[in-house]
Regions:
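An alpha-beta-alpha
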Residues: 59, 145-188, 192, 280-301
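Periplasmic-binding protein-like
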Residues: 93-100, 120-122, 214-224, 240
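C-terminal segment of N-terminal export signals and the immediately downstream linker at the start
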Residues: 27-42
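N-terminal secretory signal peptides
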Residues: 1-10, 14-30
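Hinge/cleft segment of the Venus flytrap/periplasmic-binding protein
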Residues: 273-331
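Short beta-strand elements in bilobed, periplasmic/extracellular small-molecule ligand-binding domains
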Residues: 66-74, 187-198
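Short beta-strand elements at the ligand-binding edges of bilobed clamshell
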Residues: 127-151, 161-166, 249-262
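Extracytoplasmic "Venus flytrap"
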Residues: 38-62, 71-81, 101, 166-171
Length: 331
């Protein structure tokens, strides 16, 4: 870990060896022929944060396979974010991956200043021009399925969700979990709390404890730290984005997973082929595209609801069942 002259933390991963396929893979011969492209990751939170860790791992894996050279900054504040984008563009990054939720307008302005650099960002807005693409974190399919399990497991008939900020993506994820609960248990009550930031595990824990005090006996942790409250009070919890089961073996029984690699593969392929990245890459992260899923500990929920959930899961993957997409702030 080092600092550049402006104080932004930089870590470097440069791996030139190749030989492993990338999964989507069609662009790998081209990537090998022209050499790895330089990709920068700008993380608004530490890479230990669940969302950032998913991006970080996908980028590290692509570097280990020889498709890219990966450099990154973490914990970049909103005020520093546009500057970090400019710096990486000036340093020759061909593709910049990150998140522009707090700086939507400023990020697009920076991208317009560097038309030869591709920017693909987690965003609540739309793509812009030829070089600014967007993606959403749409693991709501897995959240809905986990909600089905939770709806049949709750004994108090109250479940809770702890989220970051009520932006459309977070709202949709929490609403999907609640919809899954209601699909199998219409009388269940769903509590929602937002902690006002993307990374503050102690604050998420406190929000979870408050929901438990209000009667919730299962928590959905859109934010890391929620499971700490569940563990402390001896109740069950659902994780999001990554698999928390090994970290909380007696607490987290299901996880709504999200895989950034299909989105990254598509973006790299476009850059290598010289195609514009000014498009929406969100669909590559859907369950039916292999970009998200659910993992759960079998036998924790009743067998009949596991079977019902698996039936819906198969329908989602086949494209015959659509989980409702509700981006309104949960009430």
């Amino acid at each position: 870990m080092s600092k550049n002259k402006n104080g932004i933390h930089l870590s470097r991963r440069t791996v030139l060896a190749s030989g492993l396929a990338l999964g989507a893979g069609a662009f790998m011969p081209m990537a090998r022929a022209m050499g790895p492209i330089k990709v920068a990751g700008i993380h608004g939170s530490p890479v230990e944060n669940a969302w950032n860790s998913v991006l970080h791992k996908a980028l590290q894996d692509a570097a280990a396979e020889g498709a890219i050279e990966y450099v990154f900054s973490e914990g970049v504040s909103g005020t520093d974010y546009p500057r970090a984008m400019s710096e990486y563009a000036e340093q020759g990054a061909k593709l910049i991956i990150g998140e522009t939720f707090p700086v939507e307008k400023q990020a697009r302005t920076v991208a317009a200043d560097y038309p030869e650099t591709a920017f693909v960002m987690g965003s609540s807005g739309t793509f812009s021009g030829d070089n600014f693409g967007t993606f959403g974190t749409w693991n709501f399919d897995g959240a809905y399925l986990a909600g089905m399990l939770a709806g049949k497991m709750t004994k108090s008939n109250i479940v809770g969700s702890v989220g970051a900020i009520p932006i459309p993506e977070v709202n949709m994820l929490i609403n999907a979990f609640a919809a899954g609960v209601k699909a199998v248990n219409p009388d269940a009550k769903h509590l929602t709390s937002f902690i006002g930031t993307f990374f503050d595990p102690p604050k998420a824990r406190e929000a979870g404890l408050a929901q438990i005090d209000a009667g919730a006996d299962i928590l959905f942790g859109e934010r890391i730290g929620t499971a700490d409250a569940a563990k402390e009070r001896g109740i069950k919890s659902v994780g999001s984005l990554i698999d928390y089961t090994s970290r909380y073996p007696d607490t987290v029984f299901a996880n709504a997973l999200w895989n950034f690699r299909p989105i990254l593969n598509a973006a790299i392929a476009d850059v290598v082929a010289g195609k514009p990245v000014g498009r929406d890459y969100t669909s590559y992260g859907l369950m039916k595209e292999g970009g998200s899923d659910i993992t759960y500990v079998k036998g924790v929920a009743p067998a009949d609801i596991e079977a019902e959930m698996e039936s819906i899961r198969a329908q989602i993957k086949a494209g015959t069942f659509d989980v409702p997409q509700n981006m309104d702030e949960p009430t």
